[in-house]
Amino acid sequence: MDMRPSPRQQELMDRAYKLAMERFAPRAATHDREASFPIEDYADLHASGLLALCVPESYGGLGADFETYCLVAEQIARGNASTALTYNMHALTMLMIGPLMQGIELPPEVRERHEQLRIGN
């Protein structure tokens, strides 16, 4: 069994690691000291596309699975653990809410609204 990341996973891990080291790490101590939210880190995650890591590709996201999410989150934590923790809450919601809702019968208008909310509209 090959446990190495796939080429796509490695590319996403590298992208996250670069952000973590170059952008998040230099700001982390200030956020810890001031007990402030790392807003700049989220702007960087958005610009890199990683904020949409677990959003389905059909909605413009990267469509990552749980394993890929874990690999990326680990790299984010190298730069700022607080960013990784809050990113966890954001990204895992995208993974959890999709599959959970797929098996539930909903009126068409409710399902449509759910899908809009899922992609942030």
Q: At which residue positions do the language-model features occur?
A:
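Intrinsic disorder at enzyme termini
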Residues: M1-R8
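Glycine-rich flavin
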Residues: S36-A47, L51-N121
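Generic N-terminal segment detector
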Residues: E11-Y17
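N-terminal capping segment at the start of a domain
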Residues: L19-A29
